[in-house]
Amino acid sequence: MLKFTSEHEWLQIEGDIATVGITAHAAEQLGDLVFVELPEVGATFAKDGQAATVESVKAASDVYCPLDGEVTEINQAIVDDPSLVNSDPRGAGWFFKLKLANPADAEGLLNEAAYNELIA
Protein backbone atom coordinates (compact mmCIF):
# COMPACT_ATOMS: atom_id res chain seq x y z
CA MET A 1 0.00 0.00 0.00
CA LEU A 2 1.46 3.36 -1.06
CA LYS A 3 0.54 6.40 1.06
CA PHE A 4 1.66 10.02 1.24
CA THR A 5 1.72 12.85 3.79
CA SER A 6 1.07 16.56 3.34
CA GLU A 7 4.71 17.04 4.43
CA HIS A 8 5.81 15.34 1.17
CA GLU A 9 6.79 11.94 2.49
CA TRP A 10 5.84 8.62 0.94
CA LEU A 11 5.31 5.30 2.70
CA GLN A 12 5.31 1.88 1.09
CA ILE A 13 3.52 -0.28 3.64
CA GLU A 14 3.82 -4.06 3.79
CA GLY A 15 2.15 -5.57 6.84
CA ASP A 16 3.35 -3.55 9.83
CA ILE A 17 6.54 -2.25 8.16
CA ALA A 18 6.61 1.05 6.27
CA THR A 19 9.50 2.13 4.07
CA VAL A 20 9.65 5.94 4.28
CA GLY A 21 11.17 8.55 1.98
CA ILE A 22 10.53 12.00 0.58
CA THR A 23 8.60 12.54 -2.62
CA ALA A 24 10.03 13.58 -5.97
CA HIS A 25 8.22 16.91 -5.46
CA ALA A 26 10.06 17.49 -2.17
CA ALA A 27 13.39 16.49 -3.70
CA GLU A 28 12.82 18.93 -6.59
CA GLN A 29 11.90 21.76 -4.21
CA LEU A 30 15.02 21.17 -2.10
CA GLY A 31 17.41 20.92 -5.02
CA ASP A 32 20.60 18.86 -4.94
CA LEU A 33 21.00 17.24 -1.54
CA VAL A 34 24.45 17.41 0.03
CA PHE A 35 23.76 15.94 3.49
CA VAL A 36 21.32 13.47 5.06
CA GLU A 37 21.06 12.66 8.76
CA LEU A 38 18.99 9.59 9.62
CA PRO A 39 17.62 8.32 12.94
CA GLU A 40 19.23 5.49 14.90
CA VAL A 41 17.91 1.96 14.43
CA GLY A 42 15.71 1.28 17.46
CA ALA A 43 14.62 4.91 17.84
CA THR A 44 10.90 5.36 18.41
CA PHE A 45 8.90 8.29 17.12
CA ALA A 46 5.42 9.65 17.53
CA LYS A 47 3.59 10.79 14.41
CA ASP A 48 5.03 14.10 13.17
CA GLY A 49 8.18 13.76 15.30
CA GLN A 50 11.39 14.95 13.64
CA ALA A 51 13.03 11.78 12.34
CA ALA A 52 15.66 12.94 9.84
CA THR A 53 17.30 16.04 8.41
CA VAL A 54 18.26 16.84 4.84
CA GLU A 55 20.40 19.70 3.58
CA SER A 56 20.70 20.93 0.04
CA VAL A 57 22.58 23.75 -1.58
CA LYS A 58 19.38 25.81 -1.08
CA ALA A 59 18.00 24.84 2.34
CA ALA A 60 17.89 22.50 5.30
CA SER A 61 14.68 20.66 6.06
CA ASP A 62 13.36 18.21 8.61
CA VAL A 63 11.78 14.91 7.64
CA TYR A 64 8.94 13.96 9.98
CA CYS A 65 7.86 10.51 11.07
CA PRO A 66 4.55 9.89 9.27
CA LEU A 67 3.13 7.49 11.90
CA ASP A 68 3.99 6.19 15.37
CA GLY A 69 6.62 3.48 15.24
CA GLU A 70 10.15 2.18 15.73
CA VAL A 71 12.97 2.48 13.20
CA THR A 72 14.08 -1.02 12.16
CA GLU A 73 16.48 -0.14 9.34
CA ILE A 74 18.12 2.91 7.78
CA ASN A 75 19.42 3.46 4.27
CA GLN A 76 23.14 4.12 4.82
CA ALA A 77 23.56 4.56 1.05
CA ILE A 78 21.85 7.99 1.13
CA VAL A 79 24.09 9.13 3.99
CA ASP A 80 27.11 8.18 1.88
CA ASP A 81 25.60 9.58 -1.35
CA PRO A 82 22.71 12.04 -0.74
CA SER A 83 22.23 12.51 -4.50
CA LEU A 84 20.41 9.14 -4.55
CA VAL A 85 17.43 10.94 -2.99
CA ASN A 86 17.32 13.32 -5.97
CA SER A 87 17.89 10.69 -8.65
CA ASP A 88 15.58 7.96 -7.28
CA PRO A 89 13.40 9.30 -4.42
CA ARG A 90 10.96 6.35 -4.38
CA GLY A 91 13.59 3.69 -5.05
CA ALA A 92 17.23 3.77 -3.94
CA GLY A 93 16.61 7.08 -2.11
CA TRP A 94 14.42 5.68 0.69
CA PHE A 95 15.23 6.93 4.21
CA PHE A 96 14.22 4.36 6.84
CA LYS A 97 11.95 1.45 7.65
CA LEU A 98 9.44 1.87 10.43
CA LYS A 99 7.67 -0.86 12.40
CA LEU A 100 4.24 0.72 12.78
CA ALA A 101 2.73 0.85 16.26
CA ASN A 102 -0.75 0.78 14.70
CA PRO A 103 -0.80 -0.08 10.97
CA ALA A 104 -4.49 0.91 10.70
CA ASP A 105 -3.43 4.55 11.23
CA ALA A 106 -2.09 4.54 7.66
CA GLU A 107 -5.68 4.70 6.41
CA GLY A 108 -5.71 8.36 7.47
CA LEU A 109 -2.86 9.28 5.10
CA LEU A 110 -3.21 10.47 1.51
CA ASN A 111 -3.43 8.16 -1.48
CA GLU A 112 -1.46 9.03 -4.62
CA ALA A 113 -4.35 10.85 -6.32
CA ALA A 114 -4.97 13.03 -3.25
CA TYR A 115 -1.26 13.82 -2.94
CA ASN A 116 -1.04 14.75 -6.62
CA GLU A 117 -3.97 17.16 -6.10
CA LEU A 118 -2.15 18.68 -3.13
CA ILE A 119 0.95 19.51 -5.19
CA ALA A 120 -0.87 20.52 -8.40
Swiss-Prot record:
Limits of the Lipoyl-binding domain: 17-99
GO BP terms in the entry: glycine decarboxylation via glycine cleavage system
Keyword ATP-binding annotated: no
Requisite cofactors: (R)-lipoate
UniProt xrefs under Pfam families: GCV_H
Keywords carried by this UniProt record: Lipoyl
InterPro entries in UniProt: 2-oxoA_DH_lipoyl-BS, Biotin_lipoyl, GCV_H, GCV_H/Fam206, GCV_H_sub, Single_hybrid_motif
Signal peptide range: none
Sequence similarity: Belongs to the GcvH family.
Alphabetical list of HAMAP family matching this protein: GcvH
Subunit note: The glycine cleavage system is composed of four proteins: P, T, L and H.
Function: The glycine cleavage system catalyzes the degradation of glycine. The H protein shuttles the methylamine group of glycine from the P protein to the T protein.
Protein name: Glycine cleavage system H protein
Organism, scientific name: Allorhizobium ampelinum (strain ATCC BAA-846 / DSM 112012 / S4) (Agrobacterium vitis (strain S4))
Gene from which the chain derives: gcvH
